[in-house]
C-alpha cells in the first residue's frame, strides 16, 4: 500500500498539477477491478483508481488535462518469466484468459502512448487491458 498508493499520491500531488500538464496516466491493475491477487495489492490498486478519479476532476477543471488509469492483466516481461516457464501454471492461466495469451510489453507501451499522446477527451476512466481476465475473475489461478 505504501508503494502502490501512498507514494503514487505523493508524486502525483508534487508533479501533476502544473500549467503545462496535458495528461496523467496511472498504472493500476485488473486486480483493482476484480479484487484478485493479494488483498493488500488489490486494495492498493483499487485505491489508485479512486485517487485517479479525484485527480481527473481536479485536472480537468483546472488544466483541461486528461487523467486515466490502465488496468493491465498479465504482461510478458522478464519478471513474469517464472510464471510462463511453469508449464502447468501457464496452461491454467491461458485456460482462464479469454484471449489465451498475455500482453507483450510493446502492446502495453502502445496503450500508454495512446492514452498520453493521442487521447484528448477520455478522462476519469480505469481501462481494462487484460485480455478478458476481468471476465474470469472467479477463475483466478495464480
Protein language model features and the residues they cover:
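A short, exposed helix-loop element centered on a Lys and neighboring polar residues
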Residues: 12-13, 53
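Catalytic loop of short-chain dehydrogenase/reductase
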Residues: 22-47, 52-61, 74-75
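Conserved Rossmann-fold SDR core element
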Residues: 49, 59-76, 122-129
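A glycine/serine/threonine-rich, flexible loop-to-helix segment
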Residues: 74-96, 138-142
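Short C-terminal tail/terminal secondary-structure segment
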Residues: 113, 120-142
Amino acid at each position: 500500500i505504501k508503494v502502490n498508493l501512498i507514494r503514487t499520491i505523493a508524486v502525483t500531488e508534487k508533479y501533476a498539477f502544473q500549467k503545462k500538464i496535458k495528461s496523467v496516466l496511472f498504472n493500476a491493475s485488473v486486480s483493482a477491478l476484480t479484487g484478485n491477487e493479494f488483498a493488500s495489492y488489490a486494495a492498493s490498486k483499487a485505491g489508485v483508481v479512486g485517487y485517479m478519479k479525484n485527480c481527473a476532476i481536479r485536472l480537468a477543471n483546472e488544466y483541461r488535462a486528461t487523467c486515466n488509469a490502465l488496468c493491465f492483466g498479465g504482461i510478458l516481461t522478464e519478471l513474469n518469466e517464472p510464471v510462463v516457464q511453469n508449464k502447468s501454471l501457464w496452461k491454467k492461466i491461458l485456460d482462464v484468459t479469454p484471449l489465451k495469451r498475455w500482453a507483450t510489453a510493446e502492446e502495453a507501451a502502445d496503450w500508454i502512448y495512446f492514452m498520453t499522446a493521442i487521447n484528448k477527451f477520455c478522462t476519469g476512466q480505469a481501462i481494462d487491458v487484460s485480455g478478458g481476465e476481468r471476465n474470469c475473475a472467479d477463475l483466478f489461478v495464480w
